């Protein structure tokens, strides 16, 4: 008989895919002797069975749940649904990966009217019993039936206001009894049925809600953001309740074994007295720092420190630990690898190596490649910060700096981001419903919550700047206003600037400056460089981009797009005159001017390269992109060329194409206008000789774009070789150079063995290769690709991660056929996929020489290349 339910004692940390991350760790902690309340786990197999059976929870699975529930009754000495001594449980989702989009926790399940009275009589504490029941009704209504939580909060606020209470803890048993009646009314009005009194029915509904949450929109969005496979499913954790809301010797908290923002080796966290677990995460009350527990309960604090050390040494990673204190006794409810910033991830990984806990290889595999984005982006410019007006200070929940316009709803934040507006999402507190808005925002600001609230944890995981618990601000999400302590109101669209490292909120925009990296980052990157096989180059067209990339560890230029040099406002008139020239002499006279400009560009790049590879792609776009569209520009051009406006307009119309991206561009320009590529080749070689004569090694790579046939490349190569040889003869010097091609047309992949006869190198232009393979326009595909993801037609954006079965198969074919002709043919990638970690793993497996990407993605590519090499070496998956 297939098994779907497991006692904690039956599991281990290795069973994460079956028991979920939370369940596997509860099992592990039970087995190493930590004080974990007993319970059991419904496996991910049960979730997949539920999904496969049209969202029906089978009787066989529920019978197995009842068997384990009976065992839990024996372990606790309590009976589920028995009024005199009721067993109460918590129900939590538990996917194999931590997922903020999943169902929230339900506490105190098993309470009903009779059990609440029984609990009050048993403990002699009616207030605590009623408080637990009202919390359960709210959680059950919110989580299982999706009744908006604010409806319950409004009822609570009314009673507090009527009695002039400031805190929830001021409510007495009579107040709470009244609140329970109000909550039941809210439930019945929202659902059309009374609040369920049968505990087994409560449990069945909660299990179904967990399974349903696996496919809710929040979870789907989160999985898409983090490339998590939907087939994993989620487990359900059912655990005997312990109570943190039974007075001042009870409480609840979350602690990290190291600081999740900085990586510092110091316990970091928060706790609330007389509260239950979700109070800390929900951010409804502002908690105390964990250090304050030393004064409140020194024995518990000492035991907690021991637990932190034990768990970190057991898992050999920073842990995020959830705990409850019941009448002075510590219980551990959860441990997991703590979400952390990139700075913390790198410091912790390097420190763990230095402490002898893990190897350098393990440290490399431990840091998530995409997290490095956090380290490489701007901070506030110090000079600008001096004039900044601080309007509030909250908790520095996730480091970094951001400036943007404020929006109060996640949906509106997404819409604004799609319009290119820099967004700061402002909320009283965030919830899983806000996940997409958070992902699209530059920063998050909340009035409530602490350093371990939903906003803080999710923002750190995303690498977003976040300030939480900013109680000085009054946020009205309905009226979309932010009231400052001065009485001034800000509205949607107003600018704020946030420093997530200090918690300070500034009025207006503050200029940003480049991030500073070093120390632990450089050490980890040095370890990565020692492991990787792929070289990492940069796509750079300007000296500033190239210099920046070299600081990030680039090993040369993999793509210099010469057309970008032509768009300078001082150069574009000459480019236009060259295109519109009516004779060869007229065109060559303008090309001579452009040649000197290009020589200056190339010389500077060669000097900065200092012997590193520089791959220069010759003119690629269709000519119409350079031509004027505005009437005033056409008139200016006509005057400069001594032509009439109609003459210029007619010529522009002649050059216009119905489908320019598949038209007269790339190498096709060199077939009809060979003088253009000849000029560029001469500029490259002459500038290389200038720099060579300065004592700097130069070995330029000249790349011909859009080649479809061997004959195209052969014709252009011959023309260029003749021009280059003439320079060598004139200058009496010879320098090494290579002529190769971009492989970006499917036909070039199929005939790569022929093209390799003429090419010194292949550089895969995966952007155009993806467009031409799919027949998608990269600029327009976003209009319909979202439907493809939603309907599972495509798993992800093929312009972000290489389509291994289609585009990838063409690349593999070209690699194989190219090497049939030239065994040591140099091959690399210069499309956007060159900076994507998943694609880099694929390119490593193909044995390419290098990948090339934008400057800020160079460190990501370095780490991804090392992880790919280690994955191959040890046959382990990359992160």
Give the residues covered by each predicted segment:
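Structural motif
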Residues: 237, 407, 424-426, 445, ...
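Short beta->alpha connector loops at strand-helix junctions that form conserved
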Residues: 40, 447-449, 468-471, 560, ...
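Glycine-rich phosphate/ribose-binding loops and adjacent secondary-structure elements
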Residues: 329-331, 431-439, 443-445, 451-457, ...
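Nucleotide/phosphate-binding sheet-loop regions of phosphoryl- and nucleotidyl-transfer enzymes
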Residues: 1-388, 414-417, 421-424, 431-436, ...
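Long, charged amphipathic helices and adjacent flexible linkers at domain junctions
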Residues: 223-228, 364-415, 422-423, 492, ...
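C-terminal accessory/binding modules appended to enzymatic or scaffolding proteins
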Residues: 12-15, 398-440, 807-823
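Conserved alpha/beta-domain cores
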Residues: 92, 517-520, 527-879
């Amino acid at each position: 008989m297939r098994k779907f339910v497991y006692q904690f004692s039956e599991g281990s940390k290795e069973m994460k895919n079956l028991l979920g991350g939370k369940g596997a760790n509860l099992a592990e902690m039970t087995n190493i002797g930590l004080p974990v309340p007993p319970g059991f786990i419904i496996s991910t197999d049960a979730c997949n069975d539920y999904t496969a059976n049209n969202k029906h929870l089978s009787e066989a699975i529920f019978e197995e749940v009842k068997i384990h529930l009976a065992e839990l009754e024996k372990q606790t000495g309590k009976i589920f649904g028995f009024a005199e001594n009721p067993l109460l449980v918590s129900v939590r989702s538990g996917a194999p990966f931590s997922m903020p989009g999943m169902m929230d926790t339900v506490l105190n399940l098993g309470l009903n009217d009779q059990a609440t009275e029984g609990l009050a009589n048993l403990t002699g504490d009616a207030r605590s019993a009623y408080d637990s029941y009202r919390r359960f009704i709210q959680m059950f209504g919110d989580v299982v039936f999706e009744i908006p939580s604010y409806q319950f909060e409004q009822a609570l606020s009314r009673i507090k206001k009527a009695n002039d209470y400031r805190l929830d803890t001021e409510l007495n048993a009579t107040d709470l009894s009244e609140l329970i009646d109000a909550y039941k009314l809210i439930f019945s009005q929202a659902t059309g049925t009374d609040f369920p009194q049968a505990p087994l029915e409560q449990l069945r509904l909660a299990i179904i809600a967990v399974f349903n949450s696996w496919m809710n929109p929040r979870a789907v969005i989160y999985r898409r953001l983090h490339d998590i496979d939907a087939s994993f499913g989620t487990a359900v954790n059912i655990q005997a309740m312990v109570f943190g809301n039974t007075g001042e010797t009870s409480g609840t908290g979350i602690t990290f074994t190291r600081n999740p923002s900085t990586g510092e080796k110091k316990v970091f966290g928060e706790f609330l007295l007389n509260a239950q677990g979700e109070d800390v995460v929900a951010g409804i009350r502002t908690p105390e720092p964990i250090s304050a527990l030393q004064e409140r309960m020194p024995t518990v604090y000492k035991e907690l420190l021991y637990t932190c050390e034990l768990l970190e040494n057991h898992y050999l990673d920073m842990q995020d630990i959830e705990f409850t204190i019941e009448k002075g006794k510590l219980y551990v409810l959860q441990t997991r690898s703590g979400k952390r910033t990139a700075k913390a991830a790198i410091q912790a990984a390097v420190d763990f190596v230095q402490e002898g806990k893990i190897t350098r290889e393990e440290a490399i595999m431990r840091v998530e490649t995409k997290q490095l984005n956090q380290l490489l982006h701007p901070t506030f410019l110090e000079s600008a910060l001096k004039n900044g007006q601080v309007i509030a200070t909250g908790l520095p929940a996730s480091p970094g700096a951001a400036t943007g316009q404020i929006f109060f709803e996640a949906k509106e934040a997404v819409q604004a981001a799609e319009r290119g507006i820099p967004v700061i999402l402002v909320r009283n507190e965030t919830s899983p419903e806000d996940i997409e808005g958070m992902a699209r925002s530059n920063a998050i600001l909340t009035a409530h919550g602490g350093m371990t609230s939903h906003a803080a944890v999710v923002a750190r995981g995303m690498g977003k700047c976040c300030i939480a618990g900013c109680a000085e601000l009054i946020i009205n999400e309905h009226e979309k206003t932010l009231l400052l302590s001065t009485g001034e109101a800000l509205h949607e669209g107003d600018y704020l600037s946030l420093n997530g490292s200090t918690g300070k909120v500034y009025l207006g925009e503050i200029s940003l400056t480049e991030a500073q990296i070093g120390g632990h980052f450089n050490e980890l990157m040095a370890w990565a460089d020692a492991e990787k096989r792929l070289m990492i180059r940069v796509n750079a067209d300007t000296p500033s981009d190239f210099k920046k990339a070299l600081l990030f560890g680039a090993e040369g230029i993999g793509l210099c797009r010469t057309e970008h040099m032509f768009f300078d406002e001082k150069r574009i008139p000459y480019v236009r005159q060259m295109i519109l020239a009516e004779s060869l002499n007229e065109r060559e006279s303008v090309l001579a001017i452009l040649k000197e400009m290009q020589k200056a560009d190339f010389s500077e790049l060669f000097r900065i390269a200092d012997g590193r590879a520089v791959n220069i792609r010759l003119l690629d776009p269709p000519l119409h992109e350079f031509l004027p569209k505005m009437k005033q520009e056409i008139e200016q051009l006509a005057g400069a060329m001594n032509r009439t406006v109609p003459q210029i307009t007619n010529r522009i119309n002649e050059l216009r194409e119905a489908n320019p991206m598949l038209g007269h561009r790339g190498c096709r320009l060199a077939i009809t206008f060979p003088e253009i590529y000849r000029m560029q080749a001469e500029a490259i070689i002459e500038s290389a000789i200038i720099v060579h004569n300065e004592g700097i090694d130069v070995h330029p790579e000249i790349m011909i774009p859009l080649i479809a046939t061997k004959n195209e490349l052969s014709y252009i190569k011959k023309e260029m070789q003749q021009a280059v040889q003439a320079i060598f003869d004139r200058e009496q010097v010879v320098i090494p150079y290579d002529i190769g091609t971009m492989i970006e047309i499917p036909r070039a992949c199929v005939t790569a063995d022929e093209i390799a006869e003429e090419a010194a190198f292949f550089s895969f232009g995966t952007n155009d290769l993806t467009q031409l393979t799919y027949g998608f326009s990269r600029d327009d595909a976003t209009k319909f690709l979202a439907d493809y993801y939603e309907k599972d037609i495509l798993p992800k954006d093929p312009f972000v991660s290489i389509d291994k079965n289609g585009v990838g198969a063409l690349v593999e074919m070209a690699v194989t056929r190219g090497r049939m002709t030239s065994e040591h043919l140099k091959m690399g990638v210069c499309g956007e996929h060159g900076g994507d970690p998943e694609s880099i793993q694929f390119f490593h497996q193909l044995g390419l020489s290098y990948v090339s990407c934008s400057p800020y993605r160079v460190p990501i590519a370095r780490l991804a290349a090392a992880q790919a090499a280690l994955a191959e070496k040890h046959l382990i998956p990359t992160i």
